[in-house]
Amino acid sequence: MRQVNILTLSKALQQLRGHTLSSFECFLSANKLTPPYHKGLNPPAWELGHIAWFQEYWIARNLQRSHGLASDLSQPRKASLLNEADAWFDSAKVAHSTRWDLKLLTPPKCIEYAQESLAQTLELLRNETDHSPALYFYWLVLQHEAMHLEASAYMAQSLSMPFKALWQHEAAIAENSQSTASNFEQQRVDYRTARVPSQNWKLGSRDFSSNSAHDKTPFCFDNELIEKTCSIQDFEISLQPVNWAQYINFVIDTGYRLPNYIRQTGTDFETEVFGSWQPLNKDAPAVHLSWTDTQAYCVWAKCRLPTEAEWDCAAKTLTDFEWGHVWEWTQDTFEPYEGFVAHPYTEYSEPWFGTHKVLRGASQFTHAVLRDVNYRNFFTPERDDIYSGFRTCAL
């Protein structure tokens, strides 16, 4: 969902903020606003404040926003709604480990800040046009909030607390995916693969800043540019991610550890979902797996992960390619495409090149606004708290 339309944007911004506030209320009701330190997550109150801060930083405070990607970042910004906002919520300057020690706003004040930030954003959006370069920043803050919304599910799962991810219904099936959130209650009797022929493949998004008006991609992240041509040799790839039946066979055969939130009960298995244990659906994709876990499985199964280009090609050319239930690890290290130029939010991609692995697809907790076949997610290879799985290619 990357359409340039002010009405669409306005509705999406309001809807997403509603989900963000509902998520915050879950943590508040569960008395989990000050959880134990976790290097991959943030305290919920800091998360909410950061989302509100990020929105006003790039919209209301950004006097250069009308220039879009040509904005001069050296120019001063307007003052924040909060005097302490930059000192509290600027993720580029506030060290992660210190966020647990900050004396932040009370929960009602956090909520008020989030509401005020949204209100001024919507007021400014009403004065924009559908093809204004400024819309880049509105889309940026929308997608940023969707990322943090998904992270709230990671946090709730790690805390084993009750949690309602109401936005799941809106993310059920992405427009350009094939049964992305398939009904895994249906028994899957086989594990299908498909062969993709050798070809030159264009990887990445079109540069919307230089295309003609009728052919513009309204938004993309800087790491998706510049579209490049890759030479792909023919390969065979699974049409679905590895499921629990397959992964548990690997665990039983090798003695490899069970993933987080999975336990064996006699001869069967259960999974913990937001603090509630329930029977494991073995037809569902295996999840909460690190890149390291996928490598161990591939050695055992005599297969490999797809490269990022192979995943991209298969997702866009194979009719029955299912994606969108779990983020899928690829072989590739997160690197810039040739000709990469950082967008105004320079901290988004550039600091992480060379240290993270690329994941493609989406998870069941990825909001519809973030679901896009070109989207490049990236995490360090040991992360298994995220909703990550994988599919395989034949050797």
Tell where the protein language model's regions lie, with residue ranges.
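Short, contiguous alpha-helical
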Residues: 10, 15-18, 25, 30-90, ...
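Acidic/His metal-coordination segments adjacent to aromatic residues that form catalytic metal sites
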Residues: 94-106, 278-279
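Short aromatic-cysteine micro-motif
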Residues: 107-118, 221-254, 271-318
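Core domains of carbohydrate- and sulfate-ester-processing enzymes
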Residues: 75-96, 190-199, 258-277, 348-363
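Flexible inter-domain linker/hinge segments
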Residues: 160, 164-201, 207
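Surface-exposed recognition segments
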Residues: 225-228, 255-260, 322-395
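Cytochrome P450 core scaffold surrounding the K-helix E-X-X-R motif
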Residues: 204-223, 244, 249-250, 256-257, ...
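Short, polar loop/linker segments at the starts of domains and inter-domain junctions
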Residues: 104-105, 206-232, 371-381
